C-alpha cells in the first residue's frame, strides 16, 4: 500500500557566514598569500551579490520566528492530504497525523483509526500495518530520501552553514503570482536549489530543484509551495503545502493543528515497538 510522502519544512538555522569559499578565504588572515590573491581577484559585485543572498536568508529565519524557530527539536501536525497523478486527483483526500524529530526521524499515520503508518529513521523506511513492519520499496524510499536531502530544513540548516556552498541573489521573480526575491544555493556536488522569499514578509514561499533520473537519465523538476502562514508557539508555520513534479501537481496538504517541542515518545520511531497511537503517549 502506498501513501503520499508528506515533507514539510519547519526548521532551519544559520550559523557562520555562508557566502561561499571565496569570501571565507578573503576574510581568513591565516590564508597563504596565494589564496589571498585569488580571493582578491573576485569582482566586488560578486561578493556583494553573495552578501545580499545571505542577508535575505537571515531575514527569512527571522520571519519564521527567529530563535523560537531555531529551537524546534520536534513537532507534530495533523490535517488532510490529497494526492494527484498528472495533475488529476486520485482520491478525496485522507486524514494524516505526522510526527518529526530532527534530524532524521519521521512517522506519518493515516486512516481514521491511525492503524497504517509510514516510518523513516535514518536511511531506512517501513510501512506499519496490523501485520507488522515491512520495508518500504527501494523506489519509494529513494523518493523520500531525495525530498529530505533537498528539504528546506536541510538546505537552510546544513547548506547555509557550509562554506563550500555558493549563494547567488537572482533578483526579483514570481512564485506563482506572488512577487519574490529569488536565491540560488549550489553545493559542492553541483546540486542547486532555488528559494523564493516573499518580497514583503521574507518567509519562503517556494522551493525548486532539479535532479536526473538514474534510469532514464531524464531531468526532473520538483517544486514546493508554502502558504497560509500562522504563528504557532512563536514559529511562523505554513498551514498549506503543495508539491509539483515537472509542472504537475503531485501532493497537496492542509494542516489543521501543529505543536512544537512536545517531547515525542521514542517508541513511535521504533518499527518493532508495537507503538499504539490511540494509547496515552509516554514523554521522554
PLM regions with names:
Residues 1-4:
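Positively charged n-region of N-terminal signal peptides that target proteins for export
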Residues 12-13:
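C-terminal motif of bacterial Sec signal peptides marking the signal peptidase cleavage site
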Residues 23-52:
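Post-signal peptide N-terminal segment of mature Sec-exported envelope proteins
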Residues 41, 48, 55-133:
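N-terminal mature ectodomain segment of secretory-pathway/periplasmic proteins
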Residues 49-53, 124-191, 214-218, 271-284:
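Flexible, processing/modification-adjacent segments and terminal tails
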Residues 72, 103, 162-164, 178, ...:
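Extracytoplasmic
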Residues 90, 134-136, 205, 237:
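Generic structural signal for well-ordered beta-strand positions
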Residues 178-271:
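Gly/Pro-enriched, hydrophobic low-complexity segments
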Amino acid at each position: 500500500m502506498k501513501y503520499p510522502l508528506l515533507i514539510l519544512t519547519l526548521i532551519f538555522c544559520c550559523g557562520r557566514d555562508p557566502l561561499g569559499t571565496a569570501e571565507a578565504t578573503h576574510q581568513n588572515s591565516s590564508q597563504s598569500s596565494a589564496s589571498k590573491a585569488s580571493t582578491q581577484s573576485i569582482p566586488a559585485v560578486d561578493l556583494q551579490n553573495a552578501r545580499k543572498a545571505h542577508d535575505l536568508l537571515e531575514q527569512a529565519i527571522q520571519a519564521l520566528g527567529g530563535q523560537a524557530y531555531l529551537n524546534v527539536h520536534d513537532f507534530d501536525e495533523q490535517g488532510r492530504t490529497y494526492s494527484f497523478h498528472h495533475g488529476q486527483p486520485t482520491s478525496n483526500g485522507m486524514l494524516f497525523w505526522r510526527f518529526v524529530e530532527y534530524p532524521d526521524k519521521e512517522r506519518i499515520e493515516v486512516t481514521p483509526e491511525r492503524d497504517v503508518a509510514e516510518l523513516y529513521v535514518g536511511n531506512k523506511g517501513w510501512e506499519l500495518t496490523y501485520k507488522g513492519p515491512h520495508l518500504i520499496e527501494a523506489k519509494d524510499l529513494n523518493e523520500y530520501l531525495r525530498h529530505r536531502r533537498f528539504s528546506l530544513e536541510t538546505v537552510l540548516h546544513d547548506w547555509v552553514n557550509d562554506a563550500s556552498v555558493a549563494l547567488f541573489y537572482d533578483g526579483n521573480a514570481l512564485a506563482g503570482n506572488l512577487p519574490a526575491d529569488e536565491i540560488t544555493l549550489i553545493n559542492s556536488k553541483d546540486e542547486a536549489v532555488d528559494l523564493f522569499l516573499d518580497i514583503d514578509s521574507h518567509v519562503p514561499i517556494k522551493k525548486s530543484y532539479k535532479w536526473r533520473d538514474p534510469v532514464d537519465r531524464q531531468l526532473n523538476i520538483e517544486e514546493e509551495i508554502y502558504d497560509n502562514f500562522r504563528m504557532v508557539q512563536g514559529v511562523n508555520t505554513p498551514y498549506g503545502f503543495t508539491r509539483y513534479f515537472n509542472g504537475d501537481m503531485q501532493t497537496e496538504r492542509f494542516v489543521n493543528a501543529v505543536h512544537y517541542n512536545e517531547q515525542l515518545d521514542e517508541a513511535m520511531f521504533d518499527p518493532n515497538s508495537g507503538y499504539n497511537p490511540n494509547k496515552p503517549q509516554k514523554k521522554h
